Amino acid sequence: MTYQFSHDDLIWKALGDARRRLIIEVLATGPKQTGDLVQLFPDIGRTGVLKHIDVLTEGGIIHVRREGRTRWNHLDPEPIRSVCNSWVAKHIDGIKSSATKLKLIAEKEQ
């Protein structure tokens, strides 16, 4: 039996690497050519950067537009926002409960 990755799994995978998070931060300032992104990581070269771009594209975080031989990479922050909001919503009740308890303890001590 093999596990099927959900779309959310692909987004978390994309966010799980520091280099991919840096690519996201750079693209948050605007679209960049692939060559610009390659310059950020001289240690892994073009092939390594393209593999990271592929993971981000698979998660829907980056959209690539080709103009001739030039690849423009565009950030779509919505998938990140969606999985983060969903994850926080699942855990917020416990956080609210802890905060309420902390407030009650603090008020008793006064």
Q: Which sequence ranges carry the predicted segments?
A:
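Charge-dense, helix-prone N-terminal extensions
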Residues: Q33, I62, A106-Q110
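Short, hydrophobic-biased segments on the C-terminal half of alpha helices
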Residues: I53-D54
